[in-house]
């Protein structure tokens, strides 16, 4: 006679969502630091291993994803998506700019193990631009070894355009390599709960529980900035496009797209939801069938906010002065970084080192910032995805409605 036992708490966590596992690791790390400081410091090795794995996989991830995306671009698709594409890019840049303003208004700091003496901060915008240009012409192998993400991007874009003229077998190989690297990233991400357990335990054991308040403040800045973009910046852009009250459309998209994306934490998984909402709004099928998948790739307002806020938090922590031109340049760089964050779990976090390079911050310190992002990622990633995905359908609807209004007005004049 066999008896069936209901799955215990550990089994449910082991087979549950990554969000629940990370939350469990966060709670267990806090408890261990509170109960035993020596034990908490000992398990810090788990966090060190996790950060090391991130450092190893991030450069090759950026190279393969960008190269495969450009090489496999499909020609001949003619749809009326230029206004939507413009809104995507303008919205992402506006989000990064709002994040800069928010970060200056409410500066946050992080608890990093390295001191400001480990870096050589730039003196101004001229030195930053010189550093960016020199990074672009770096040897590709050297760029991969040193985590020079700007150089990696340049080589990935160049190779991607060159491979467009290659045969389909070569393009398929590049795409398969990209999928293989993405699989490795997902494998590393699956160990995030263990890594976060070690990071939280060792951090609290060495710096005290006051560290939590620093992360809480950082979360408030991140989520507050995302709310500002969702409820102020995006409505302004939509009003500029349709010239009428934008909030019914904004709230509809947040309710029927954003809420679902908040829990799935995947813009790609939310594409069918956005497609259904576009059909419900009677939008042009030829337009939204292209713009929604495109938006899931390049419309990354939430990612731009995450990259900007965490980068400026690291800058504040290290005491690096930031002038206005450099802050504006950061908005542009964060926007470009955000466009490369699609389809990867924690993609926006893994692209933070690229923005950190602007300020002379080493890859080691930048990856500590990434680790902080994973600690707060339970809420940050959900809010980021909700903003990203709901904005896809919002801007698509705004552009389509503006075009319908233009055609209707033209018909009335005739």
From Swiss-Prot:
InterPro entries: Na-dicarboxylate_symporter (IPR001991), Na:dicarbo_symporter_sf (IPR036458), Ser_Thr_transp_SstT (IPR023025). Gene3D superfamilies: Sodium:dicarboxylate symporter. The keyword Transmembrane helix applies. SUPFAM superfamilies: Proton glutamate symport protein. It catalyses: L-serine(in) + Na(+)(in) = L-serine(out) + Na(+)(out); L-threonine(in) + Na(+)(in) = L-threonine(out) + Na(+)(out). Its main location: membrane. It comes from the Bacteria. The chain crosses the membrane at residues 16-36, 46-66, 84-104, 143-163, 180-200, 218-238, 300-320, 332-352. Residues 37-45, 105-142, 201-217, 321-331 are periplasmic. Keywords: Amino-acid transport, Cell inner membrane, Cell membrane, Membrane, Symport, Transmembrane, Transmembrane helix, Transport. One of its GO terms (cellular component) is plasma membrane. It is a multi-pass membrane protein. GO terms for molecular function: neutral L-amino acid:sodium symporter activity. GO terms for biological process: serine transport; threonine transport. Residues 2-15, 67-83, 164-179, 239-299, 353-414 are cytoplasmic. It is found in: Cell inner membrane. Involved in the import of serine and threonine into the cell, with the concomitant import of sodium (symport system). Belongs to the dicarboxylate/amino acid:cation symporter (DAACS) (TC 2.A.23) family. This is Serine/threonine transporter SstT. The gene is sstT.
């Amino acid at each position: 006679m066999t008896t069936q036992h209901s799955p215990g708490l550990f089994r449910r966590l082991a087979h549950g969502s990554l969000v629940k596992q990370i939350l469990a690791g966060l709670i267990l790390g806090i408890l261990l630091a509170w109960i035993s400081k020596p034990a908490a410091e000992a398990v810090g090795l788990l966090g060190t291993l996790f950060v090391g794995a991130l450092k190893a996989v991030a450069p090759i991830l950026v190279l393969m994803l960008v190269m495969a995306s450009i090489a496999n671009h499909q020609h001949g698709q003619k749809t009326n998506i230029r206004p939507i594409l413009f809104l995507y890019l303008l919205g992402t840049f506006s989000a990064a700019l709002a994040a800069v303003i928010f970060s200056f208004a409410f500066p946050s700091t992080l608890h990093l193990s390295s001191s400001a003496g480990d870096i050589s901060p730039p003196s101004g915008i001229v030195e930053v631009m010189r550093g960016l240009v020199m990074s672009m012409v770096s040897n590709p192998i050297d760029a991969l070894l040193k985590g020079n993400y700007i150089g990696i991007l340049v080589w990935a874009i160049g190779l991607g355009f060159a491979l467009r003229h290659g045969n389909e077998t070569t393009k398929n190989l590049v795409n398969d390599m990209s999928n293989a690297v993405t699989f490795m990233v997902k494998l590393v991400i699956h160990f995030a709960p263990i890594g976060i357990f070690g990071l939280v335990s060792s951090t609290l054991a060495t710096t005290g529980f006051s560290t939590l308040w620093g992360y809480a403040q950082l979360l408030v800045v991140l989520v507050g900035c995302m709310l500002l973009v969702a409820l102020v910046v995006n409505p302004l852009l939509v009003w500029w496009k349709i010239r009428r009250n934008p909030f019914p459309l904004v709230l509809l998209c947040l309710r029927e797209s954003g809420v679902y994306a908040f829990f799935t934490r995947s813009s790609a998984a939310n594409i069918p939801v956005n497609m259904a909402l576009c059909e419900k709004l009677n939008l042009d099928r030829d337009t939204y069938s292209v713009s929604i998948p495109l938006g899931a790739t390049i419309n990354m307002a939430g990612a731009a906010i995450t990259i900007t806020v965490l980068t400026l938090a690291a800058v504040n922590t290290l005491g690096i002065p930031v002038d206005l031109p450099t802050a504006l340049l950061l908005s542009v760089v964060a926007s470009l970084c955000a466009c490369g964050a699609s389809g990867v779990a924690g993609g926006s976090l893994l692209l933070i080192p690229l923005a950190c390079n602007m300020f002379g911050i080493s890859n080691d310190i930048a990856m500590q910032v990434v680790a902080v992002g994973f600690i707060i990622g339970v809420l940050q990633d959900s809010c980021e995805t909700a903003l990203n995905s709901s904005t896809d359908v919002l801007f698509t609807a705004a552009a389509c409605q503006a075009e319908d209004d233009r055609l209707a007005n033209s018909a009335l004049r005739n």
